[in-house]
Amino acid sequence: MARLQQHYREKIVPELTKQFGYTSPMEVPRLTKITLNMGVSEAVSDKKVMDNAVADLTKIAGQKPVVTKAKKAIAGFKIREGQAIGCMVTLRGVQMYEFLDRFVTVALPRVRDFRGISGRAFDGRGNYNIGVKEQIIFPEIEYDKVDALRGLNISITTTAKSDEEAKALLAGFRFPFKN
């Protein structure tokens, strides 16, 4: 069992039950999945860039990502239908908690000029999105072996019914919100 998973069961569930007045522990919001998505626009002209992006995301997530392909052709972006334009990986269970632990305790403090993450990036249904500008904040990525700095989007999906519940859940996981 992951460290954060145990922390969730022992500390967060009782706190949230008390705070929001849940009658059953099954009502307490929990993390469903974490999705890491990396859009690679340079892959249109150079196929090797996609391999490097997949390798980076594999190191970060600990599992192999799936290559996302264009649904439609867009002439303005020189994209053809079915062409590889990004990669994504969905984490669930123990891997999800392990990634979240590394992200909050190791990766976020390595962000330049870090003052906390925004508390406004919730979608209204209890899910949270955060964009990372550089993949080198993760300790798995070696700075010398990076060909280009690529950003990625991290989507945290929860069972929370409101943003307030989701924020309390993520704050329980020690997310450093600035407001």
Swiss-Prot record:
GO terms for molecular function: rRNA binding; structural constituent of ribosome; tRNA binding. The gene is rplE. PANTHER family: 60S RIBOSOMAL PROTEIN L11-RELATED. Part of the 50S ribosomal subunit; part of the 5S rRNA/L5/L18/L25 subcomplex. Contacts the 5S rRNA and the P site tRNA. Forms a bridge to the 30S subunit in the 70S ribosome. Coiled coil: none annotated. Keywords: Ribonucleoprotein, Ribosomal protein, RNA-binding, rRNA-binding, tRNA-binding. One of its GO terms (cellular component) is ribonucleoprotein complex. One of its GO terms (biological process) is translation. The keyword Kinase does not apply. SUPFAM superfamilies: RL5-like (SSF55282). Transmembrane segments: none annotated. This is one of the proteins that bind and probably mediate the attachment of the 5S RNA into the large ribosomal subunit, where it forms part of the central protuberance. In the 70S ribosome it contacts protein S13 of the 30S subunit (bridge B1b), connecting the 2 subunits; this bridge is implicated in subunit movement. Contacts the P site tRNA; the 5S rRNA and some of its associated proteins might help stabilize positioning of ribosome-bound tRNAs. This is Large ribosomal subunit protein uL5.
